[in-house]
Swiss-Prot record:
Keywords: Fibrinogenolytic toxin, Fibrinolytic toxin, Hemostasis impairing toxin, Hydrolase, Protease, Serine protease, Toxin. This is Alkaline serine protease NJP. It comes from the Eukaryota. Its EC number is 3.4.21.-. On the 2D-gel the determined pI of this protein is: 9.2, its MW is: 33.5 kDa. The lineage of its organism: Eukaryota, Metazoa, Spiralia, Lophotrochozoa, Annelida. Inhibited by PMSF. Not or very weakly inhibited by EDTA, EGTA, beta-mercaptoethanol, benzamidine, aprotinin, iodoacetic acid, pepstatin A and SBTI.
Amino acid sequence: VTVVQYRSTNASSGYLNLRVYLLDTGLR
């Protein structure tokens, strides 16, 4: 795994986690 691939994977997973977090807080 190259650094670029790691960073892009990390960014996409962080974006998905942020969306889940916002959806979770929006439902409460």
